[in-house]
Structure formats: structure tokens, C-alpha cells
Amino acid sequence: MGLRMKSATGLLVILLIAFALQLVAVLSVPVTKTISLGSYQDHKFGVFGYCNVKDGTCSPAGVGYNLVDSDNAGFSLPSNARHTLSNLLIVHPIATGFTLILTVLAMLAHIQGPASSSRYLLFCLVFSLPTFLLVLLSFLVDILLFVPHLDWGGWIVLAATILVAISGVVLCVMRRTLSSKKAMKKHQLDTTNELSAFSSHKHLNSFTYSSKENVPQFSELRYETSHDTSKDEEVLPLTSHVYEEPGHHVGDTSYASQGTNNSRVNLLTSEEPQAPKRESPFKDQRQDRYTPDRYGPSPDRYDQGGPGRPPNGSRGVPPRRPSNGPTPPGQGPSPTGAYGRNNNPNYNGGYNNRLPRPRGPPGSNNSSPFLGARNGPGLTPPHNLQTATTGPMQLPAGTYLPGEEPANSPDTYGPGVIPIPEIRRESKVPGASPTPPPVSGNSPPTETSESGVSRPYRGNYSRRGSEASAQTPPNAQPNPPPGGAQNYEYVPARQQWNLTTEESNATAPAPGPQPLQRNHSYDTYNPYRSETPSAPGSRAQSQGTDDNLGTLHQPVPTTVTPSNSGALNNKDSPWYSPPVDEQFRNSFIPDAPVSPSESISSNFTSVSQRGINPRYFGADGPPGGLHQGAPPPPHMRGPPPHMGMGGPNMGGHNMGGHNMGGPPPNMGPRPPYGGGGPGHGNKHDLLLSGNPDSQFQPQTRRKPGRGGRPGMSPASLMGRDTGPYSMR
């Protein structure tokens, strides 16, 4: 239990002082001889008696006493009145007692329980009021008895009266403060309760309660059986069969274009149904990466038997027969759950036949060790499509038997790959028929094998095409391939070397000497090259222009083509194809005319960066002009016969020249160096139109080459990649 050092502490201090003052007044004479309430002529008066100061005698202590009768002149009241009032001096001890009780109550106000109780403070306040009245009464008695001879003992009672009054005020303030706090707390509590009540009411109103009438008494789970027959095919097991009428087309079931519903399959004939096809989970990946039947249809698409399997079987497993029909003739019973070809060319196999297989001429069966061989030794003969029908097998347009598709089929190499077309040549071999140009139309071309047997172009053999073949009447005749069959005979490559002379003589436009010509297959683009061939005897065109610049449209040399080069050199032929280098050059030919100033210009930005040509004299030529008939410089003379260049017209010794060192067939007499031909004596004929730095000055006389022939072209003019002033 502790004290609260608040307003109760001040109250306690005030009451203690008031109690002390009153106690001093009560302890006056005759209790003590020093403290008196009043004095008159050698007598001192107190609460309980009086004392004579001179002789030191005191009256017995008691309530009320009789004053000295001898001298009544000194007091305001007569002696009888003063004797009655002397009995009221007993109020001093009573007032002191009340003050003591109030002091104790003020001390208890420091305790937690009484201090927080407004009733306790109210009791203290009520008790302080009589205490104050008693103290005030004691002071009044003193004044009546001892005035005008009141001593200091009477004045301290006045001080005690004032302090008791102050303590009453403090008690009132304390109670008011406590009551205010309690009222404030109560108000706060009431406000909080109201807010909480409002919140609770709002929270309760946010819930909606359903009545018991809307709540079902129990839950019911119903199972409804669907009678929709359109969904029956989606739940068919894998071993079930769906039979269709003969010739009825259900839908496209090819792996190349499968639909969403693959539960029904086509029937090739009305003899035997097929097993349902399962959709491969890798269909989309195969369609994205490869085209259907990239290497052609597999041999096991055509119901052919192989080692360990009968006809129409699937790798040793007999075909599945219908549950309500007999087994086809020549076949044994099939086990449960087996899948076979069922005499249906639409069957693609389990993995769409992605394994590559080698090609070969008809009769080799194009068998693969992974897919089984056809017509193995001692095995059952193949059961192909022609045995199932009375007439010849008919395939739709664009569909071919396995192994008989052309090599350059657009479907062979996959999407985005364009095969290079083969050049059709006119064979010069006796007995070979010329190849006619292709006939315009939608039918694909044919392909001829090495053995000379024509075979149709297969193209993209998909199951859609097989379905079309299944719908075709069996007695219909097959469509003949456009353009007819072509028979090519094999001719060794070296045999064409002996035929080049005959072909050259046969295809030559007119007899006569021909200028020296180069193989232009390796020439690069030159905008100054002439479009027309050089005339015989033209020295400047054959030497300056033709040797270094060449012509745009030169015939393909006969020595580099195996056979039938006439179709290539003939521009009017539909099979004419310009050389690749010519196509490359034509793509860079400027549309506008080229200025002649480019002939003396250079790509170098400064003259100091250009090489010095000591033999270049500008457009005016060397001083003194050119000498007619001057021989070429030593570096332009031809090599000796034993060091021939080995070209087609140079006659080298055992270097692969034409006719092994013999004279070239088109070699003719060349005009003398520096002139000899009409219009070729100009000094500008020696200028190379491509670059002035490559010009050279002719010599004044010509020395015959060692071991050479007159008119032989110098070695430096064989190609512009050779010589001291090469164009590279």
C-alpha cells in the first residue's frame, strides 16, 4: 500500500499545521506556565485555569474558573458573564480533536483505494466543515473572555481556524478533480461503447441469412446416359471396325493431311475391312520438318510379302480379317489384335515410312533391309495391286509406283529446296532418239532409268492419291505420260572426246579460218565487251578486245560439253541457258551508256598511288607511230613446242591439247603484228579498253619464236590472268 503524492499531500500538510496550532492553544496555563490566552495584572489565563505571576500560584485545572473579583475595571464583560464564558474554553480541545481526525483522513487519501473514491473525498469534505466550525468557535471564546487582554495564544487559534478552512477547500477541489476524471473516463467509455456497438451492429447487418425454406434437405447426384449416336465413333476401341459401303469415301486419312476424327478408315475394296488407324503423336512435328514421302512410298505400302511374312501381312503377322467374314483365299487365320495391309495401298505403316531407301531401275524392287525384301528367293510371289483387279493398275495424275519417281521431284527434297533442272541434250549417238521439248500441261514429266525403260513421274505419293486410285474404275486405262517415253543410252564420258571434232565441223556456221577463241566460262564482267563475234582477219578485235575482254555471247566450247551442245549454243532453243558468268555480268551492266573517259581513268585517288607503266604514251601513241609488221616483244612470244600451254587450240606436247599436239582445227593464218587486215592498222588497236596501264608498245621487228609456227598467238594473250600486265 503506497501513498499517492498528489493533492492529498497538500491537504495533509495543511491539516498538520492546523492541528499543531490548536494543540499549542490547549496546552496553555495552568498546563504550562509559558503559554497563555490572555493576561491581566500579574495573572495569566489559559484554557483550564489561571496562574499568579508574582507568587507563582495557579488555580486547579478544570473547565471554567472564577476571575479575580477585586479588579473588574480592566475587562469588557462583567465578572458573571466572564465566569459563564470560561466554561466555553473546553471547545479548544474538541476542535483540536476534529482537526486531528481530519489530518488522519487526509493521510488515508494517499492510499490507492480512498484516493480514487469520490465518496471518500466527499466524506472528508463533510467532516472538515464541523472541524472548521469548532476551531472557529474556540477562537471566538478566547476573544470574548480575554479582549482587550488577549495574548498570542489566542491568535494562534485564529491561524488554526484559517488552515482548517483551507483544508476544506482542498478537499473540495480534490473531490471535484476526481469526479471530473471519472466523468471523463465514463464519457470516453460510453463513446467507445457506442462506437463498438455501432460497428458491431453494422457488421451484423452485413450478413444475409437465408431462410430455412430455401435450404435443400439433401443433395442429389444424377448420372445421365447420352444417346447421341454422333459421339459413338469417338469412343470406339482400337480393335473395333467400322464398315462402309464399297467405294464410299469417308474422309482423308493420310498422314500428310489428317483430320481431327480418325476413327474411320477407307476401304479399298468391299472384300475386307481395315483396322482403325491410330493417330501418331508426332504428326505435327513430322509435318513441320519433312514433307510427306520424302524418299518415296515404302515398299510395304503395296501389300507385298517379305521374309517371314505372307502377302498382305505385317512383318510376319497375317492380316486381320473381319469378324463376320471369311478369310481371303490363300491366307491363314490372323491373331487377335494384329494389323495388316488388307490389300490397301493407303496403308502407310506405323511411322509414315521415314526410312530412306535406295533407288534403282524397275525390277530391283528398291527393297530396304529395314522394310523387308520383295520376291525373295523361295518366297511367295508378290501380291501387288494388279493381281487384285482384272485390268491394269491405274494411278491418278501425279501418283507413281515406288522407285519410279523422277530424281528431281519437287517433293523429293522437301519444302524450300529447288532442284537444279537437267539440261536436255540432243544425243549424237547413233540409235538414240532426240528429246522433244516438254508439252505444256498439268501432267508431270517422265523419267528414264539407266536401262532405257521409261517410268512415270511419281511426285508426292500420299494417301489422298491412293484414295483417288481406289475410286477409279478397275477397267479404266492409265493415262499415257505426256511427251511419250524417252530412251537414253549410256555413253562413256571419254567417248565424247572423239566426237567433238565431228560436232564442231557439223555445227560450224561456215568453213574458213576462225580466229583464236578463248574459253569464256571463266571470264568476269566487262562492260566494254562487244556483243558481236569477231570477224575473221580482224586483228584488233581478235587480239585486243577478244583476248582480254571477250564477247558476251560466246558459244560453249565443244570440248567441255559431253554431248549435244547445239541446244545450249542455240539461243532460239527453249533449252538455251546463258552461262552463270554471263548472268552475273549482265546483272552489273549499267543501263546508261558508258563514257569513254573511263578507259583512261583509274580507281586510285592519286597519281602517286598508281603504278608506273614505262610503255604507256597516252592517247597520241609513241613518237614516230607504229611500225607495220613489228614482232611482239619477247615476253609476248609463244612458248616452244615442247612447253605448250595445253589449251584447246595451243597444241602442247602431251599436255592435254587438242588432238595431242596436232594443229588446232580452227587455227587459221593470223595477220602480221601491227596490221595486215583492213581497218586494223591504227595505232589505237593495241590499247586495251579496260585499263590503260595494261597497254604495251610493240617492237619494230619480229623475231620468229623458237620452235613456233607463224601466226602463233603469244602466250601472254592466252588469258588476262597470264602475262606481266595481268588484269587480276
Swiss-Prot record:
Main localization of the protein described in the UniProt heading: membrane
Record's subcellular location: Cell membrane
Membrane topology note: Multi-pass membrane protein
Positions in the Extracellular compartment: 32-87, 142-153
Compositionally biased spans, kind Low complexity: 333-355, 362-372
Region described as Disordered: spans on this chain: 268-728
Cytoplasmic side: 1-10, 109-120, 175-728
Compositionally biased spans, kind Gly residues: 644-660
Bilayer-spanning residue ranges: 11-31, 88-108, 121-141, 154-174
Gene Ontology CC terms, in alphabetical order: cell division site; growing cell tip; plasma membrane
Compositional bias per record (Polar residues), positions renumbered to this chain: 383-392, 495-507, 516-548, 556-572, 596-611
Basic and acidic residues: bias regions: 274-292
UniProt keyword annotations, A-Z: Cell membrane, Membrane, Transmembrane, Transmembrane helix
Biased composition (Pro residues): 319-332, 630-642, 662-672
Domain of life: Eukaryota
Function: Required for the proteolytic cleavage of the transcription factor RIM101 in response to alkaline ambient pH.
Similarity remark: Belongs to the palI/RIM9 family.
Protein name: pH-response regulator protein palI/RIM9
The species this protein was found in: Yarrowia lipolytica (strain CLIB 122 / E 150) (Yeast)
